[in-house]
């Protein structure tokens, strides 16, 4: 005997719902208990066990009678328990996060494409990870994709794995250099690990080698998400970036069957590095035609180009999203300040000696070009290290230059720019190492001079370092004002130096100081950050290995730039670790820290950072550093080496660099205007509003979770107090409830944002809410159990003038999808519907659906005798046959609406993935029957 998906069956003494996966193996039924959770799914082998069709019985007035709260509690328990919701988005019933309305825009845009090729370039801290994962979860739940790979820098891999599992219930394997061999051991001889594991998070550095690249191209899944996508643009002279670009280009090659149909989602906050050709290479991954777009897309003649690109590209400022569709997103307010220090006399004299040495080294025109460039970069590296700390300066003076091995001028310059100028946008890995000064070509006297300078630097540590002393005062101010600060440093020795000093000063006061650098593997970095977050008073000292991708907002709310980055974008990335959605504090602080008489800081602050901040303040957007590094090098050389002893304060703005900044601003303004997607977004916004209302109706929203949790816990005997966080004492509740909730006798919870230490974030899929809903539903369906919700009730109220009957209906739908391979793929959808009428069942006057919600909030104005209430209920239940034709009509109408919604949001049909039909299981399950009597009605009518 076969059973349709969604059918109600009886086996092992209870009722079950047939799940879609039952079609995967002949003779095997996968069943979920009626009223149970996903954790209770069971397989039954038909040749060995008996399974029969079942019907859902009507409520029994003798044992199922409840009060006025019963219907609302039962309704909330059922819909919060749905994991196959019948709304337009199947994924939202499964995710452990309630997306902000603006985060649904990329999802709607993506579903209008086939294949999906999206570039999500929203500002830092808006939630691009959530936006991309929503698309992935939706495609999985629609049966359109069977696998997913996330390509990301290795230091972000564990964070991606955690987000996929905890927020989207996608359990992915990490494919890194350290894990690949273990994963491959579980594969068959002819099986790739990407065939073995449907969901993976893959290091872009691991996969780009030719051997691994070819294997990935052969077996990669049909959906790929690329984080930090700007590092995958084709960039002249950057072999790593070029390799990554070639991999992605091959993944979506239109001349291969898999490539032409593969979905690709690119994520980056900085899509445009300033190089138009590089930007076009990124766009070409969305559509090869975008590679040849005109440089200037303005004008009516380019409207089609703009509209075509706008369908694939979403880029929004945070300011535009703080209030979106009547929903306010609580982004923190950023307090920006500067602070400075003055070099001690001893440090100033030492700085002058080092600067003189560097000028002498750089301006030696007797050397051949390659040696000149090595010396230039070595001198610049030394000055950067000296501006950072005595420890960094000493280490640099004792280390070999990172550029010394370059065989050509071009190789020397490429390595120098990467190691010194912070212009490498690939990622923050490896940039915190000391670049070194020794070239290997020094005379003995020159080498001794370097070592003597290193020994002098050693003597300046501690008391001779005004920068460190002033920074300690600033950290004390942060802590005194209740902030948990992060100090970002440029070099590894500086982190160790600063962290050691702060520990000596602060640990006796109960402040815990932790140091994190690129020397630690990514998983150890996260462990240290999490461990530090458990302390009330904490300070994190780190390099830029934590400036990208890592979310630190849960434990930290202030940033001190101990060392100035020479790339303003890096400052924005640092501050974005704490200034982002989910920050529990209303305000965050950022402090730019510099030496007032430090010539290195002066140049960087004047020509790069302040200019960048002024542009950001004026436009509200982040403009990348001009990409012409030669002009930047010239500005630095003019300021540091060719202007003699001119005070930093007297340096004029450098005209060539100013021109570059102005050009970058014009380009960004023009780009934002051209790609503003005003017409497209206006249409999408209207659609988001309509679909969001339907989603909330079907599966509930944050407010429903909050209301249900409070009401259910109180009625079950828990002591509930407070607001945010909610404090719950479960000691006097039934043991079955404590077992279902699974968090001991006490818990603290919030329903939005980031929970503080010791609190839970309760979403509709959190085990606490899931367990509570399952307990309420189970005790309602089993009349032998005592619970807060019952399946029927009678309420006397002055809010109705005629006897009104409210029916709580659970509907199950069997959706048949057709995949790319032409095979039918069954899906299950569940919906909860209210139906109501006045009068008796045989002469029912059906009420409009939009008038029924108000009945759930009605309280009792007077009591009614229990036996009289049962008599009213029996009259309805005994004549229920008269209501079935109307209920079948409602089920058919809901099925049609579900079919239309399924097709409406997935308009693209090129792949052939489509809903063929939606069948409603009839009759609908009648979960509850509730009668509302006029207050003056004293007898049966």
Features from the language model and the residues they span:
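SF2 helicase/translocase NTPase motor core
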Residues: 44-73, 78-108, 115-116, 128-133, ...
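Hydrophobic positions on the alpha1 helix immediately C-terminal to the Walker A/P-loop
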Residues: 131, 135, 278, 470
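Conserved Helicase C-terminal RecA-like lobe
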Residues: 136, 330-343, 372, 384, ...
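Inter-lobe coupling linker of SF2 helicases/translocases
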Residues: 189, 196, 201-221, 233-414, ...
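A short beta-strand element within the Helicase C-terminal
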Residues: 220, 278-281, 551-563, 589-592
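P-loop NTPase motor cores of the ASCE clade
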Residues: 387, 405, 417, 430-435, ...
């Amino acid at each position: 005997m076969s059973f349709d998906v969604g059918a109600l069956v009886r086996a092992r003494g209870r009722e079950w719902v047939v799940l879609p996966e039952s079609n995967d193996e002949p003779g095997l039924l996968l069943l979920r208990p009626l009223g149970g959770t996903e954790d209770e799914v069971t397989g039954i082998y038909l040749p060995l066990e008996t399974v029969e069709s079942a019907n859902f019985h009507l409520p029994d007035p003798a044992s199922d009678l409840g009060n006025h709260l019963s219907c609302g509690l039962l309704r909330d328990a059922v819909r919060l328990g749905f994991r196959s919701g019948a709304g337009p988005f199947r994924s939202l019933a499964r995710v452990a996060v309630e997306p902000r309305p603006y985060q649904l825009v990329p999802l709607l845009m993506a579903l209008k494409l086939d294949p999906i090729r999206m570039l999500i370039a929203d500002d830092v801290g808006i939630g691009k990870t959530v936006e991309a994962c929503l698309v992935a979860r939706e495609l999985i739940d629609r049966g359109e994709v069977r696998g997913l790979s996330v390509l990301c820098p290795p230091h972000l891999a564990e964070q991606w794995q955690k987000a996929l599992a905890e927020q989207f219930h996608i359990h992915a394997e990490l494919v890194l250099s350290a894990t690949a061999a273990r994963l491959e051991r579980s594969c068959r001889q002819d099986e790739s690990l990407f065939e073995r594991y449907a969901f993976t998070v893959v290091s872009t550095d691991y996969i780009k080698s030719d051997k691994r690249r070819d294997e990935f191209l052969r077996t990669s899944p049909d959906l790929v998400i690329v984080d930090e996508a700007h590092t995958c643009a084709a960039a002249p002279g950057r072999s790593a970036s070029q390799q990554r670009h070639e991999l992605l280009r091959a993944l979506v090659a239109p001349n291969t069957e898999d490539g032409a149909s593969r979905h690709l989602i690119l994520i980056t906050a900085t899509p445009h590095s300033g190089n138009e050709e590089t930007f076009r290479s990124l766009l070409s991954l969305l559509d090869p035609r975008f590679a040849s777009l005109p440089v200037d897309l303005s004008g009516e003649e380019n409207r089609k180009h703009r509209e075509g690109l706008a369908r694939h590209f979403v880029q929004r400022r945070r300011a535009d999203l703080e209030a979106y569709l009547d929903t306010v997103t609580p982004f923190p307010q950023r307090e920006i300040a500067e602070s400075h220090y003055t070099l001690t006399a001893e440090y100033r004299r030492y700085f002058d000696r080092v600067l003189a040495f560097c000028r002498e080294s750089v301006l030696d025109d007797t050397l051949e070009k390659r040696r000149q460039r090595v010396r230039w970069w070595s001198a610049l590296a030394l000055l950067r290290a000296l501006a950072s700390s005595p420890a960094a300066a000493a280490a640099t003076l004792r280390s070999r230059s990172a550029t010394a091995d370059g065989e050509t001028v071009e190789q020397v310059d490429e390595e120098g720019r990467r190691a010194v100028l912070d212009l490498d946008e690939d990622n923050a890995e490896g940039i915190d190492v000391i670049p070194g000064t020794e070239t290997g070509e020094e005379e003995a006297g020159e080498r001794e001079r370097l070592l003597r300078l290193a020994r002098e630097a050693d003597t300046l540590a501690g008391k001779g370092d005004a920068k460190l002393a002033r920074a300690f005062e600033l950290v004390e101010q942060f802590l005194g004002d209740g902030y948990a600060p992060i100090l970002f440093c440029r070099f590894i020795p500086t982190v160790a130096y600063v962290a050691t000093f702060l520990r000596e000063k602060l640990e006796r006061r109960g402040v815990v100081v932790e140091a994190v650098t690129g020397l630690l593997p990514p998983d150890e970095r996260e462990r240290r950050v999490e461990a530090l977050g458990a302390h009330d008073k904490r300070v994190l000292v780190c390099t830029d290995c934590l400036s990208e991708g890592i979310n630190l907002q849960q434990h930290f709310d202030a940033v001190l730039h101990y060392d100035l980055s020479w790339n303003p974008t890096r400052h924005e990335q640092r501050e974005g670790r704490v200034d982002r959605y989910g920050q529990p504090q209303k305000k965050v602080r950022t402090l730019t820290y510099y030496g007032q008489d430090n010539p290195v800081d002066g140049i960087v602050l004047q020509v790069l950072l302040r200019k960048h901040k002024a542009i950001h303040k004026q436009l509200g957007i982040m403009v990348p550093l001009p990409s012409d590094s030669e002009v930047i090098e010239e500005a630095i050389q003019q300021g540091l080496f060719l202007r003699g002893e001119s005070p930093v304060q007297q340096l004029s703005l450098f005209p060539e660099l100013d021109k570059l900044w102005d050009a970058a601003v014009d380009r960004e303004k023009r780009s934002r205007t051209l790609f503003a997607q005003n017409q497209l977004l206006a249409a999408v916004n209207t659609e988001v509003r309509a679909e969001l209302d339907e989603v909330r109706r079907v599966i509930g929203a944050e407010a429903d979770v909050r209301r249900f949790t409070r009401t259910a816990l109180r009625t079950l005997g828990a002591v509930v107090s407070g607001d945010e966080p909610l404090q719950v004492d479960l000691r006097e509740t039934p043991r079955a409830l404590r077992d279902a909730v699974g968090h001991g006798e006490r818990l603290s919870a919030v329903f939005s944002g980031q929970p503080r230490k010791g609190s839970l974030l309760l979403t509709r899929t959190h085990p606490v809410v899931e367990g509570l809903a399952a307990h309420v539903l189970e005790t309602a369906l089993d009349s032998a159990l005592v619970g807060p919700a019952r399946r029927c009730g009678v309420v006397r109220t002055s809010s109705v003038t005629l006897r009104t009957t409210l029916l709580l209906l659970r509907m199950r739908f069997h959706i048949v999808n057709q995949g790319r391979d032409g095979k039918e793929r069954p899906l299950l959808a569940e919906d909860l519907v209210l139906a109501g009428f006045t009068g008796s069942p045989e002469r029912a006057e059906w009420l409009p659906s939009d008038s029924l919600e108000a009945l759930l909030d009605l309280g009792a104005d007077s009591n009614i005798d229990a036996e009289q209430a049962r008599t009213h209920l029996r009259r309805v239940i005994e004549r229920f046959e008269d209501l079935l034709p109307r209920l079948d009509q409602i089920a058919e109408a809901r099925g049609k609406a579900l079919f239309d919604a399924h097709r409406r949001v997935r308009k693209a049909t090129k792949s052939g993935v489509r809903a063929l039909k939606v069948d409603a299981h009839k009759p609908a399950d009648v979960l509850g029957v509730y009668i509302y009597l006029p207050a003056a009605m004293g007898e049966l009518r």
